[in-house]
Each structure stands twice: as C-alpha cells, then as structure tokens.
Amino acid sequence: MLSVLDKNTVSIFLKMARKEIEKNNVYFVGYRTVESNGKEKNAKQALLDIGINNLKEIWSHIKTLEVDDCFRISKDRDLKRDNNAEMFEFKKIINKKNVYIKLTINERCLLCLSFHLDNNGGN
C-alpha cells in the first residue's frame, strides 16, 4: 500500500503522463519479451492476449489510470535508460483481464515499458 506522499507523487505523475499522451509524446517499448501465461512472448503479442490490436489503444487505457491502480514506485534497473528514473507500476482490469503496466517519464517522452497480463506482480 502506498503512503500519502507516494499517492501524491502518483497523482502528479498521472497528470504529467496525460499531458504527454495529449501531445503524442509517447513510446511503447515493443521490442522487449515478457512472460505472459507462463510463456515468453514479444510485447506486441502480449497486447493481443489482452485483446488490444492497435498500439493507440494502450494510451487510451493509460489515460484512465487512477492513483489507486498504482501498487509500487520503483527505480529503473536498466542502467542504459536512466538509473535515477522512477518506475510507476499499475494493475488494471482491461477487457476483463488483470493487466500489469509499468510507466516512466524521461527527458524525451512518456515510456510504457510493460503492458501485459499480470503475472502476480512481476514483469
């Protein structure tokens, strides 16, 4: 459970994320592989498992995220990106499926690092 301070941070992050989406200043990291339903899949195939056929749909779902959907704020472990970046991790029901979403904002845009079926909190 997030603290009041963390919830305020998430609220600010979501406002910034929505502004970046409105400006189309977004990037989905589609080259990654993820574990979904116990199998390794590319990120785009994982979207199909949720019932998402168009990348633009993920941004519509992200715009509807609420503070209470966030369950963790963590640091980026991939030093190639930014070791100081905060990662915001969410769980949301989409198309009757439990979905795990990981987002961050860097100096360029809003990044969606994960958007796939929830594997009990991991990615």
Map each language-model feature to its residues.
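Compact soluble domain cores
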Residues: M1-N84
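Short linear sequence elements within intrinsically disordered, low-complexity coil regions
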Residues: D76, I93-N95, N120
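Basic/aromatic recognition patch in beta-strand/loop cores that engages polyanionic ligands
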Residues: K80-I105
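Enriched for short, Lys/Arg-rich terminal
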Residues: N98-Y100, T104-N123
